[in-house]
Structures are given as structure tokens and as C-alpha cells.
Amino acid sequence: MGLEKSFILFSLLVLVLGCVQPSLVGESKESPSEKFKRRHMDEEGPYQSSPTYCNQMMKDRGMTSGRCKPLNTFVHESWAKVKAICSQDKVTCKNGKSNCHKSISTLNITDCLLMGSSKYPKCDYSTTARQKHSIIACDGNPYVPVHYDATV
């Protein structure tokens, strides 16, 4: 009887730990698609191109922590429109992989380029608003954007 109770209690403990542990670890983990959204999506977008837009956005989105990210592009379109690129023209990515897609239409974007004399921790960026085609890498199930590859 004592052995049965021990087995039942052990089984319950394993069950509880199995349920609790993944949620503790998983909550702070960012999926590739969530990382793409954080780094590249700004649906609201700048209504007017402000010279400080990139400095503020790069800082707010955590891309100047520990180093200055040299280049980043923000897309000012709906998530649905950006996700739809994953079913558009397939092209080869810069790294040679075949999971990139080129947008059929131009997108409203802002390119942030680290200025040459800028050094961490003071990351200064030039801000350039454009309408260009974008090349986006997609992955997963569902097939969603995971990497901004290029502007063309």
C-alpha cells in the first residue's frame, strides 16, 4: 500500500513539473516570427520622416543593447500584407537559402543605417523613408516571415 502511494505521488509530481517547467522557460523565449515583428514591423509608421525616428525605434526595440546594429529596416504595412509575401515570388536569399520571397508590390519602409562615426553606447542612425520591394525569408508552420533579407 505504501509503495502504491509513493508511485502515485511521484507520478503526480512528474505531471506537475512537466506542466509548470515549460511555461516558465517558454514565456521569455521569442519565436523567429515574433523576433521579426519586433525588429521590423511598425504598422503605424512615421507619418512624417523624423530624423530621430531610427534612433528612438532602434533603442525601443532592443537593437542597441550591447552593440549598435549596423542596418535595419522597418516596414509600415499591416502584418497581413507582410505575411502574404510568403506566398509571392520565390527568390534566393543572400545566404543562398531558397526560402525567400520578393514582394509583388512596393512597401512603405524606413531604412536605419548606423552613421560611420557612431560608436556604442551612443548609436546614431540615419533615417530614410522609401517605397521599395522587400525580400523576406519565411519559415515554419504556419509559413510566416522570420527574416528581412533585402530591399530592392
UniProtKB/Swiss-Prot annotation:
GO BP, one annotated term: defense response to Gram-positive bacterium
Localization annotation: Secreted
Active site: 40, 147
Catalytic activity: an [RNA] containing cytidine + H2O = an [RNA]-3'-cytidine-3'-phosphate + a 5'-hydroxy-ribonucleotide-3'-[RNA]; an [RNA] containing uridine + H2O = an [RNA]-3'-uridine-3'-phosphate + a 5'-hydroxy-ribonucleotide-3'-[RNA]
Gene Ontology MF terms: lyase activity; nucleic acid binding; ribonuclease A activity
Enzyme class: lyase
Protein name (Swiss-Prot/TrEMBL): Ribonuclease pancreatic gamma-type
Annotated segments matching region Disordered: 26-48
Disulfide-bond pairs as recorded: 54-112, 68-123, 86-138, 93-100
Comp. bias intervals (Basic and acidic residues): 27-43
EC code: 4.6.1.18
Subunit composition and interactions: Monomer.
Cited InterPro entries: RNaseA, RNaseA-like_dom_sf, RNaseA_AS, RNaseA_domain
Keywords on record: Disulfide bond, Endonuclease, Hydrolase, Lyase, Nuclease, Secreted, Signal
Sequence positions that bind substrate: 35, 38, 69-73, 94
Recorded GO CC terms: extracellular region
Signal sequence coordinates: 1-25
Protein family per UniProt: Belongs to the pancreatic ribonuclease family.
Functional description taken from the UniProt entry: Endonuclease that catalyzes the cleavage of RNA on the 3' side of pyrimidine nucleotides. Acts on single-stranded and double-stranded RNA.
